[in-house]
């Protein structure tokens, strides 16, 4: 395959901070993520991979990518993604930044092949995919208000909430959301295996 001779010439990674627009907020529990008092947002790592073919791939991850790791990947076959992942595991790159590198490599490979990445990964399964709004654990009334805004302002028809800390609170949150949005949006509580057999019916 012609693309297999494409080599990485440079990897750059930059941390960015994206402030949340209310009512968006921290997804996991009640943690506050931000810069300065009252600023809520999300940090991300934007990865750019340049190649000797003049093609650039972009990816998004989390954490930091050490400059020595980026230098070590220079010259590696950009289309041998498994080899790059193995090399990153070997030198101890955390999953967050590694995912950004992998995403950028897939983007680069798709551009080189003139194909959407979904084709490289086996083909399109469906024409449309439902996008789910996610919220952390909030008080029931706040959860209901957030669900309403997600649905009315942004058109979400699927809403995911965190759960698992307190089954009674989780039930109260679910009931409040259902009262607020009814059957206009599907509720998807996610307890992350937080319930034991005694709590789960």
Identify the meaning behind each predicted range:
Residues 2-10, 14, 111, 115-126:
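N-terminal amphipathic alpha-helix/helix-capping segment at the start of soluble metabolic enzymes
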């Amino acid at each position: 395959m012609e693309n297999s001779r494409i080599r990485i010439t440079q990897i750059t990674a930059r941390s960015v901070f994206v402030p949340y627009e209310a009512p968006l907020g921290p997804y996991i529990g009640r943690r506050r993520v931000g810069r300065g008092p009252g600023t809520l947002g999300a940090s991300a790592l934007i990865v750019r991979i340049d190649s000797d073919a003049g093609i650039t791939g972009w990816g998004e991850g989390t954490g930091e990518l050490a400059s020595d790791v980026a230098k070590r990947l220079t010259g590696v076959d950009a289309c041998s993604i498994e080899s790059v992942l193995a090399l990153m595991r070997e030198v101890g790159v955390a999953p967050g930044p590694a995912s950004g590198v992998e995403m950028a490599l897939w983007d680069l490979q798709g551009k080189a092949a003139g194909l959407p990445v979904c084709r490289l990964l086996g083909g399109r399964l469906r024409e449309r995919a439902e996008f789910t709004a996610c919220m952390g654990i909030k008080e029931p009334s706040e959860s209901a208000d957030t669900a309403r805004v997600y649905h009315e302002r942004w058109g979400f028809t699927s809403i995911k909430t965190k759960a698992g800390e307190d089954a009674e609170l989780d039930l109260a949150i679910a009931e409040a959301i259902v009262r607020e949005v009814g059957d206009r949006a599907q509720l998807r509580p996610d307890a992350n295996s937080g319930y034991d057999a005694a709590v789960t019916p």
